[in-house]
From Swiss-Prot:
Transmembrane portions of the chain: none
Organism: Azotobacter vinelandii (strain DJ / ATCC BAA-1303)
Biological process according to GO: nitrogen fixation
Protein name: N(2)-fixation sustaining protein CowN
Pfam families associated with the record: CowN
Amino acid sequence: MSTTTYRSICGEESLPYIDCDRCIRALYARLQHYVQQDRGDCPICAYFREKIGSRDGSESDARLLLHAQVNVVYELFARHADQEALALLERIEDDCC
C-alpha cells in the first residue's frame, strides 16, 4: 500500500511553500494600516478596531485574527482595491490554513 504525499505528486521539484509567519505578519500590518488610516467612515475598520482591541499584535494574535476573520479581511482589501494584499491573503489561505 502506498501513501500519497505532496512529494509523490510533485516529484523532486522544490516545494512551493511560503513563509507563513512572515506573510501573516505582513498581511496583519497591512490590515492595521487601513484601520489606522480610517477617519471613522469605514464600518469594517471599526469592526477590526474592536476585534484588535488591546491585543499586542503577536504572531498568534495576528494568525488567529486572520484565520477567524478571513472573509472580512478579504472585504477590507477588496474595498481598497489592494490586489497585492488580496493575492497574499489567497496564498496564506491555500498554504497556511
